[in-house]
């Protein structure tokens, strides 16, 4: 664990400030913490750096405008592009000085893990539905914390115009910890 | 694996031995003058190989095949033994221009040289026949040449060209040899095997980017980000220590270059080089300010009138209904697939250039002027061009820079290559042009008058000021002036107000017809709509006195099935004459949820005569693709003086998945309407944009009056 | 010294690891058939194969291709023994200026290796990263279908 209680403390503090009237019951603290964590972490999931490759289409998108990927690039049978025009035809192990982004194993998330077009509730359902997520909660924590392709979002390099690509709205560590808290407290989804 | 053996022909790209040695890996050196040269055009060696000299430049338009075919038709040689090589630019000067004009622009190669090339073939043939006849002591008229052999039927004797050539070369060159009638051609009009195909398929080092000379250094250039600005200062020391760096130099007033052991090292250093620029020339200039400038030009009462029929003011004044609209065509880049490149070597005695030039003599003259040398000291070795489209003709900035760099490293060959980013941001752009068109109709919808005002930057002003007539560039009115406004209208007027900026403009495929063809043909559809008449029938009506145009138009309509598009699809039509070649096109499209799909382009073209049908079709296909890419996406924009497009991500070009089916019908009129030959390099382009926007109107109800189409919302 | 395997032969290359493969091929090994068009994997002119897969050599560094078998246009076929793609290219007369054609043919060869009888949709998907400013696309498509018949 990289950022233990540092992040957890304010989340719990926020959870305990919910006003409770006589008629209301108090939510279990873990559920509150899980929902609060999801509410914050989803902003990363919805960011173009993540969403452009978690598409619900047979192609990736690119840029903050989320345009269809140039050159007719398609998902292909194994989410690595079509047989002769693979992601790795252009995307190498590292970001290129020319602005072509790179990371080992550059690819699309499978369609079962598509987030595009879903609201926050839908994204959460996707993440927690064993049939679609293809990841256990523990694997999700690992993916969101340590997968080099996920972490690329925080090292996205410059674009083809030489301008820095926008990073997700919180640090990788903060995001990873929120995922951990969300899962540790039951991976609760908003209704 | 079952593969046919390719017909492999030698392809000589005029690489001559120079001080420093032969180019590594390039084909054998060109036949030396005097070795088998029958005439300046035709070289025949004892093994019967016929080498035909090509004076124009090959940039993909197939003239390394088409021009030799014109010679070979009359020479009566064996086509399988024909090779081609560039005529030497320097020799053309020192031998009093035996190869005539070397300019390669305005689709000129075939149409302007066909007659003297056929004559050159006939002359060499007559010299070979005369030599054989003398040896046999018979009359030349009793002999004939065919398939590389001179024969005398009466005696049954025959001699190969290779056995006759050396002696034939000493005979006088006959003048005005009668040429075959077109009906007697056996080679012209066939899709003969291409001379220049194999070196491209087997990736031989035929391009200027491939020049590799012993001891050669590499240069990368950084031009002032605002074109026309200048270098104030640069910090040589900041990059002097970087790997491979040999020299850091200023190039003219507006660029710097790093010369290094490899291009990658040179480019890394030039990108890291701190330069202070003076960009004041472009301060505040943007597309918006240029639009304002050109709009003011459209209203200029002092516009130069290029063509006038009747009194259009009176016609419009009496109109019951008026259309009065403004069209805008953007700047476009050439974006040749091979960025600007040239190798130069400068010594006290001579300057050698290995150049992808559309105009070998233009390169010579530019360098002679800039370097203050005698033109005879300039040796331009032409190579295959990795695309031209007008970028490498009158615009010789790349050749000048390469010599200005090499001159600072005397005696050492330096290959200068621009990065793609430099290439996009320092072009001579297809001009941005505005047109205001006004048409007046009577109460019954009959057309009374058509008035055109054009304003934009002048290519002549940018590249050839001596072409201006009292400051007026008539080319800005191409397609509307008397010679090429084809429509019989009762009252018409076109006028132009030139407005120049610091953005240089140049020749681009189709030149001014690339805008004006669209203005005219798109507006004609607006007229058709007002008259409530089918746009094809309106064109038929207005072209009724022009059987050649009508035949081309009808051929396209027939090919496309005009008026009967498949369900859900829409058609648009246009016809333009470029370089005496008529070209009519019909675009078949659909628009779904605002998404445009171009399904099919049907095209009929009449260049009068066709040398090589397959090359001709290829050129038309090329014009259509370039026109389609430009209409859909092409746009160079300016912000605070700088061009904003830097690479193919922000200057989109057509890709395979967007390709429509292209059907081309060649309908050569074979001299029925005159002797002038047409050129096909450009005529395929101008009709595309109007055919396309004219199809978008019935599909969406929208009249697109600015390009590119991608700037418009096509949702209904 | 790092070894680069190109067209079946090993070459010792004394260049920094971050050198794009394109420049090692062109400037160091003198293999000039692989061409520079954009430097940013936007045009496909520089396409080679790495272990049989299409690769844009302008963005792939020597580190990226360490240990890979590189094939360039020079190793695809020769006039005497053309690759089916090259034979088809000649038969259909695809090339105009020719500058992009090495990349087009290498990309097409990679496609045919994966899909010996490609559909038009397969061709669209494989070839849309290769630009041709002369507009040879229809013929590229026709030649790929023709090459498939040779295989």
Segments the model singles out, each with a brief description of its role:
Chain A
Residues 46-80:
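N-terminal, post-signal-peptide region of Sec/Tat-exported proteins
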Residues 48-57, 84-94, 179:
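The canonical Cys-X-X-Cys-His
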Residues 1-42, 62, 73-78, 95-191:
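N-terminal export/targeting leaders of redox proteins
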Residues 36, 48, 82-85, 174:
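Short, well-structured alpha-helical interface segments that form or flank functional binding sites
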């Amino acid at each position: 664990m990289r950022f233990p209680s540092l992040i957890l403390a304010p989340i719990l503090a926020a959870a305990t400030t919910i006003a409770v009237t006589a008629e209301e019951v108090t939510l279990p603290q873990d559920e509150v913490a899980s929902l609060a964590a999801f509410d914050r972490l989803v902003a990363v999931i919805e960011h173009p750096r993540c969403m452009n490759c978690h598409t619900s289409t047979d192609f990736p998108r690119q840029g903050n405008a989320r345009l269809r990927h140039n050159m007719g690039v398609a998902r292909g049978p194994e989410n690595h592009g079509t047989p002769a025009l693979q992601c790795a035809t252009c995307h190498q192990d590292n970001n290129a000085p020319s602005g072509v982004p790179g990371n080992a194993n550059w690819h699309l998330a499978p369609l079962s893990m598509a987030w595009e077009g879903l609201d926050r509730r839908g994204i959460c359902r996707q993440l927690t539905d064993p049939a679609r997520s293809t990841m256990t909660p523990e694997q999700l924590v690992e993916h969101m914390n340590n997968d080099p392709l996920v972490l690329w979002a925080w090292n996205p390099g410059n674009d083809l115009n030489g301008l820095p690509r926008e990073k997700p709205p919180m640090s990788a560590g903060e995001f990873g910890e929120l995922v951990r808290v969300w899962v540790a407290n039951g991976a609760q989804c908003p209704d | 694996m079952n593969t046919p053996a390719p017909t492999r022909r030698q392809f000589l790209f005029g690489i001559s031995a120079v001080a420093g040695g032969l180019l590594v890996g390039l084909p054998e050196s060109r036949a030396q003058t005097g070795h088998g040269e029958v005439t300046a055009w035709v070289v025949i060696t004892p093994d019967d190989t016929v080498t035909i000299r090509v004076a124009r430049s090959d940039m993909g338009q197939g003239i390394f095949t088409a021009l030799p075919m014109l010679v070979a038709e009359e020479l009566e040689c064996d086509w399988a033994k024909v090779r081609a090589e560039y005529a030497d630019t320097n020799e053309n000067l020192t031998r009093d221009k035996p190869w005539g004009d070397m300019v390669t622009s305005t689709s000129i190669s075939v149409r302007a040289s066909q007659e003297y090339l056929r004559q050159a073939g006939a002359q060499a043939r007559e010299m070979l026949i005369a030599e054989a006849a003398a040896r046999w002591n018979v009359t030349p008229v009793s002999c004939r040449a065919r398939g590389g052999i001179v024969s005398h039927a009466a005696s049954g004797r025959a001699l190969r060209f290779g056995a006759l050539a050396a002696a034939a070369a000493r005979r006088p060159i006959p003048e005005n040899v009668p040429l075959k009638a077109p009906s007697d051609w056996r080679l012209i009009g066939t899709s003969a095997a291409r001379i220049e195909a194999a070196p491209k398929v087997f990736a031989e080092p035929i391009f200027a980017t491939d020049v590799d000379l012993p001891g050669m250094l590499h240069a990368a250039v950084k031009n002032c980000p605002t074109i026309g600005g200048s270098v104030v200062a640069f910090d040589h020391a900041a990059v002097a220590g970087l790997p491979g760096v040999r020299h850091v130099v200023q190039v003219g007033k507006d660029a710097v270059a790093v010369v290094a052991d490899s291009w990658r090292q040179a480019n890394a250093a030039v990108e890291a080089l701190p330069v202070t620029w003076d960009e004041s020339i472009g301060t505040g200039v943007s597309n918006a300010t240029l639009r304002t400038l050109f709009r003011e030009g459209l209203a200029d009462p002092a516009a130069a009138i290029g063509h006038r029929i009747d009194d259009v003011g009176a016609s419009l004044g009496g109109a019951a209904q008026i259309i009065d609209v403004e069209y805008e065509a953007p700047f476009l880049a050439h974006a040749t697939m091979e960025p600007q490149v040239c190798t130069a070597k400068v010594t006290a005695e001579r300057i050698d250039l290995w150049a992808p030039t559309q105009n070998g003599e233009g390169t010579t003259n530019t360098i002679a002027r800039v370097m203050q040398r005698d033109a005879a000291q300039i040796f331009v070795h032409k190579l295959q061009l990795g695309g031209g489209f007008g970028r490498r003709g009158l615009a010789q900035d790349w050749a000048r820079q390469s010599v200005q760099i090499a001159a600072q490293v005397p005696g050492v060959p330096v290959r200068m290559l621009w990065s793609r980013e430099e290439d996009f941001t320092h072009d001579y752009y297809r001009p941005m042009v505005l047109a205001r068109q006004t048409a007046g109709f009577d109460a019954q919808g009959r057309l009374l008058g058509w008035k055109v005002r054009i304003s934009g930057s002048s290519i002549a002003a940018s590249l050839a000021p001596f072409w201006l007539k009292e400051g007026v560039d008539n080319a800005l009115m191409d397609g509307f002036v008397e010679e090429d406004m084809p429509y019989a209208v009762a009252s018409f007027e076109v006028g132009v107000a030139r407005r120049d900026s610091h953005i240089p403009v140049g020749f681009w495929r189709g030149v001014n017809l690339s805008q004006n063809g669209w203005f005219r043909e798109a507006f004609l559809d607006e007229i058709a709509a007002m008259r409530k008449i089918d746009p094809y029938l309106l064109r038929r009506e207005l072209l009724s006195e022009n059987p050649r145009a009508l035949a081309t138009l009808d051929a396209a309509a027939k090919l496309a099935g005009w008026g009967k598009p498949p369900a859900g699809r829409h058609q648009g039509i246009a016809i333009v004459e470029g370089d005496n070649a008529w070209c009519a096109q019909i675009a078949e499209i659909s628009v779904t949820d605002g998404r445009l799909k171009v399904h099919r382009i049907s095209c009929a073209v009449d260049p009068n005569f066709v040398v090589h049908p397959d090359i001709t079709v290829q050129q038309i296909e090329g014009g259509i693709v370039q026109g389609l890419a430009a209409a859909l996406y092409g746009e160079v924009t300016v912000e605070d003086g700088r061009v904003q497009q830097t690479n193919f991500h922000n200057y989109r070009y057509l890709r395979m998945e967007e390709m429509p089916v292209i059907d081309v019908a060649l309908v050569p009129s074979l001299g029925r309407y005159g002797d002038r030959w047409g050129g096909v390099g450009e005529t395929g382009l101008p009709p595309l944009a109007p055919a396309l926007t004219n199809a978008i109107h019935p599909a969406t109800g929208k009249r697109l009056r600015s390009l590119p189409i991608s700037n418009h919302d096509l949702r209904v | 010294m790092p070894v680069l395997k190109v067209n079946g032969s090993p070459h010792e290359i004394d260049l920094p690891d971050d050198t794009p493969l394109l420049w090692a091929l062109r400037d160091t090994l003198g293999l000039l058939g692989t061409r520079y068009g954009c430097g940013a994997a936007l045009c496909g002119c520089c396409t080679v194969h790495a272990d049989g897969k299409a690769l844009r050599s302008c963005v792939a560094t020597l580190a990226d291709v360490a240990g890979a078998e590189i094939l360039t246009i020079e190793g695809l076929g020769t006039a005497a023994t053309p690759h089916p793609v090259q034979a088809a290219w000649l038969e259909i007369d695809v090339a105009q200026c020719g500058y992009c054609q090495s990349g087009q043919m290498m990309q097409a060869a990679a496609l045919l290796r994966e899909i010996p009888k490609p559909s038009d949709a397969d061709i669209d998907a494989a070839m849309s990263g290769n630009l041709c400013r002369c507009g040879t696309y229809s013929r590229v498509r026709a030649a790929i279908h023709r090459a498939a018949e040779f295989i």
